[in-house]
Amino acid sequence: MNNKRHSTNEQLSLDEINNTIKFDHRSSNKQKFLSFLGPGLLVAVGYMDPGNWITSMQGGAQYGYTLLFVILISSLSAMLLQSMTVRLGIATGMDLAQMTRHYLSRPIAIIFWIIAELAIIATDIAEVIGSAIALNLLFNIPLIVGALITVLDVFLLLFIMKYGFRKIEAIVGTLIFTVLFIFIFEVYISSPQLNAVLNGFIPHSEIITNNGILYIALGIIGATIMPHNLYLHSSIVQSRTYSRHNNEEKAQAIKFATIDSNIQLSIAFVVNCLLLVLGASLFFNSNADDLGGFYDLYHALKTEPVLGATMGAIMSTLFAVALLASGQNSTITGTLAGQIVMEGFLRLHIPNWLRRLITRSLAVIPVIVCLIIFKGNAAKIEQLLVFSQVFLSIALPFCLIPLQLATSNKDLMGPFYNKTWVNIISWTLIIILSILNVYLIVQTFQELQS
């Protein structure tokens, strides 16, 4: 990576929201914190999207509470990586897509753009599938119609954006807490053993020695750290009105944006733990192998003998509501991330509605095509979700490495560059994640072929 300076005529990242939300560095710490409360919510969505659900619940159903430790480590790793994107966005005034295009050679930057665009599409595919399945479960809407309905999210997003980015943050926050409270209720009803849950946060050697547990563990790790979140976060932290030329204000902005990020990622951590605990408390040592997808989970909750007919119906319906809320949340953030990647790499100057419609269509079209080819076969569509998660594993190093190189560059970051301990941990994480993701990809294709 060269040390070319950030061009002063660089287009602002997400210019319609950039520098629009008031942040007064002279106000109290409480006011500063409240000013920066919000971007982390949009990032947290990616850590509890529909792609994570099956992995977490399967992990609990098949191996009890053992994998809670893996969720903890994954969440702590995510906090570190997201804090690096916060520093990149605030210190440089660039998002990760702009930085990658600006500081890598053109041929390499183009390759990175293609991979980033495909990663956004893969992320969106999971959300479209999750939302379509939720609509089918709740209202018996055909999957193909449900997938088409998700296109309307684009226009809903455009409508809400007219009233300010704070409205987006509020809606996303409401949907997140809807999911959180649904799963708190469901876990409470399922009555897990507290001692067993707490024991799950202690590392167990079988996570490494048992191939089945290791495979699920890798799935949890791979589904937790999402490429689109790194692009998204580096952009939306710039929505606050801190001085772009005052390092003291930048330092305060980084501090409170990081606090916001860590709080919201802690909520995502709790949701993922609740999913695993729910799977363990209801299905461990029973019909765990039958929980292959959203439909399986829905019907398993509905017919679970421990719950009874009435509570089973309530639990399964709430599960579908939470799936819809999660899918809608993720489509909002995925669309924004797609806009950031398209603008950042290509400098496209097209109307917002068209840019977002293109981003959404690129995700919906593959789902529609597969629905037509497989004649609405739900199992095949859920398999498409698996493929989308595998591609995210492939794409992850292509955004982690530029992020690491940029944030460790003192000429680029100024006083906000990575400290030595951060570099050691982040490089270790990148290497481990890359190795684990290669293993996960191989294992997934072997599973699909068997």
From Swiss-Prot:
Instruction: Give the bilayer topology.
Output: Multi-pass membrane protein
Q: Which compartment or compartments is the protein found in?
A: Cell membrane
| Regions crossing the membrane | 34-54, 61-81, 108-128, 141-161, 170-190, 212-232, 263-283, 305-325, 361-381, 383-403, 422-442
For this UniProt entry, what's an example GO CC term? Answer: plasma membrane
- A biological-process GO annotation: iron ion transmembrane transport
Q: Which InterPro entries match?
A: NRAMP_fam
Gene Ontology MF term list: cadmium ion transmembrane transporter activity; manganese ion transmembrane transporter activity; metal ion binding; symporter activity
Q: Which key words tag this protein in UniProt?
A: Cell membrane, Ion transport, Membrane, Symport, Transmembrane, Transmembrane helix, Transport
Pfam families given for it? Nramp
Q: Does the keyword Flavoprotein apply?
A: no
Q: Which family does it belong to?
A: Belongs to the NRAMP family.
Q: What does this protein do?
A: H(+)-stimulated, divalent metal cation uptake system.
HAMAP family registered for this protein in UniProt: NRAMP
Checking NCBIfam families in the record gives: nramp, Nramp_1, PRK00701.1
Its recorded name reads: Divalent metal cation transporter MntH
